[in-house]
Amino acid sequence: MLYLEDYLEMIEQLPMDLRDRFTEMREMDLQVQNAMDQLEQRVSEFFMNAKKNKPEWREEQMASIKKDYYKALEDADEKVQLANQIYDLVDRHLRKLDQELAKFKMELEADNAGITEILERRSLELDTPSQPVNNHHAHSHTPVEKRKYNPTSHHTTTDHIPEKKFKSEALLSTLTSDASKENTLGCRNNNSTASSNNAYNVNSSQPLGSYNIGSLSSGTGAGAITMAAAQAVQATAQMKEGRRTSSLKASYEAFKNNDFQLGKEFSMARETVGYSSSSALMTTLTQNASSSAADSRSGRKSKNNNKSSSQQSSSSSSSSSLSSCSSSSTVVQEISQQTTVVPESDSNSQVDWTYDPNEPRYCICNQVSYGEMVGCDNQDCPIEWFHYGCVGLTEAPKGKWYCPQCTAAMKRRGSRHK
């Protein structure tokens, strides 16, 4: 998955190439303009002295002026060809970028179906200014902590909280607010009530305890990012203060390799079922999360016997409250039996680049514009632009050039006049 690095390496020389070609075009433009100025002066002198000189002189001067005009026209045509080459160069790089994006998207979809849509939406949200609700959510702990000022010790309680911790809380609060928007009012109340008893009984005094699976379980709409964040909060709540982290990338990798086995339920529910199936899916996720948390603490049952029993009772109450939001639990079983693997044939077919059907067609091959192309100098040519390979050219022609159809038509007209 080094598409970005490869593409950046590929376009590393593009600015220099464009600068050189634009410089060459500028020089040619100045050359054409100077030639046109000189020709205009010669034409004015020719008409001033035409009556004073002999017809032979007039014909000679007229032929010389016409020759210089044709040379200036060839230089202008060459400048246009250079502009077309620059356009094709940039267009090739744009098409290559689209191809690499399509491959990267397919690679992400193969691992987690629907993840690209979530990432694109998250990127758009990051590009836009943050909402006032999210800002209030992200910094809701700061004013409270600042008021806890101890005049005797002359320091605040936030001095020991790392800066990364606030950033992680802001990220998780954004996920929480997005998840709450996608859920309905009834299930949101049940989820928050049920899961508040079991998500963070390990260390409820920590600031991260306000984020739990109930607040993040928005169904399949939040996707893998939401569940990865939920698992990260659960994992970091049990760590020491100095080892806590909420890295979304690490959480997502841990989420993929964990024993939750969520691939089938999460990916297929977004496409096949509605609200009831997503609620039933989150019931299964909460049960798995609480059971895995209980298994991880089985080695120290003797020390935390009371804590384990309270978490088991709260897990059962959470399961019952979450189950009331779904119409049937059999939907989850049907989802788990379905597969989310992208077929290999579909993957290969999507890698091949398909042009826009609305893009205009050129040349005798009736294909879109690509590579180097040459234009027919016949103003009435129905095709106008041709690929070099289709008309047997390897370099830009000098002077005027006519396509095979126009050449044949001109020959036919010439034979008729004879």
Curated annotation (Swiss-Prot):
Pfam families annotated for this entry?
Answer: ING
Q: Does the keyword Calcium apply?
A: no
Annotated keywords: Acetylation, Chromatin regulator, Disease variant, Growth regulation, Isopeptide bond, Metal-binding, Nucleus, Transcription, Transcription regulation, Ubl conjugation, Zinc, Zinc-finger
Which InterPro entries does this one have?
ING3_PHD, ING_fam, ING_N_histone-binding, Zinc_finger_PHD-type_CS, Znf_FYVE_PHD, Znf_PHD, Znf_PHD-finger, Znf_RING/FYVE/PHD
Q: Compositionally biased, Basic and acidic residues: which spans?
A: 156-165
- Sequence positions that bind Zn(2+) 1: 363, 365, 387, 390
One GO term under biological process is:
positive regulation of DNA-templated transcription
Tell me where it mainly resides.
Answer: nucleus
Q: How is this protein annotated for GO cellular component?
A: NuA4 histone acetyltransferase complex; nucleoplasm; nucleosome; nucleus; piccolo histone acetyltransferase complex; Swr1 complex
Q: Where is this cross-link: Glycyl lysine isopeptide (Lys-Gly) (interchain with G-Cter in SUMO2)?
A: 148, 165, 167, 256
* Span list, region Disordered: 127-165, 286-325
**N6-acetyllysine modified-residue sites:** 181, 264
Tissue expression notes: Expressed in brain, heart, kidney, liver, lung, ovaries, placenta, prostate, skeletal muscle, small intestine, spleen, testis and thymus.
- Can the keyword Acyltransferase be found in this entry's annotation? no
List residues traversing the bilayer.
none
**Which PROSITE patterns does the record cross-reference, listed alphabetically?**
ZF_PHD_1, ZF_PHD_2
Q: Zinc finger (PHD-type) residue ranges?
A: 360-409
Any GO MF annotation of the entry: histone H4K5 acetyltransferase activity
Binding of Zn(2+) 2, residues: 376, 381, 403, 406
- State the similarity comment: Belongs to the ING family.
Could you describe the subunit structure of this protein? Interacts with H3K4me3 and to a lesser extent with H3K4me2. Component of the NuA4 histone acetyltransferase complex which contains the catalytic subunit KAT5/TIP60 and the subunits EP400, TRRAP/PAF400, BRD8/SMAP, EPC1, DMAP1/DNMAP1, RUVBL1/TIP49, RUVBL2, ING3, actin, ACTL6A/BAF53A, MORF4L1/MRG15, MORF4L2/MRGX, MRGBP, YEATS4/GAS41, VPS72/YL1 and MEAF6. The NuA4 complex interacts with MYC and the adenovirus E1A protein. HTATTIP/TIP60, EPC1, and ING3 together constitute a minimal HAT complex termed Piccolo NuA4. Component of a SWR1-like complex.
According to the entry, the disease involved is: Squamous cell carcinoma of the head and neck: A non-melanoma skin cancer affecting the head and neck. The hallmark of cutaneous SCC is malignant transformation of normal epidermal keratinocytes.
- Give the protein's function: Component of the NuA4 histone acetyltransferase (HAT) complex which is involved in transcriptional activation of select genes principally by acetylation of nucleosomal histones H4 and H2A. This modification may both alter nucleosome - DNA interactions and promote interaction of the modified histones with other proteins which positively regulate transcription.
From the Swiss-Prot or TrEMBL record, give the protein name.
Answer: Inhibitor of growth protein 3
Organism annotation: Homo sapiens
- Name the gene: ING3
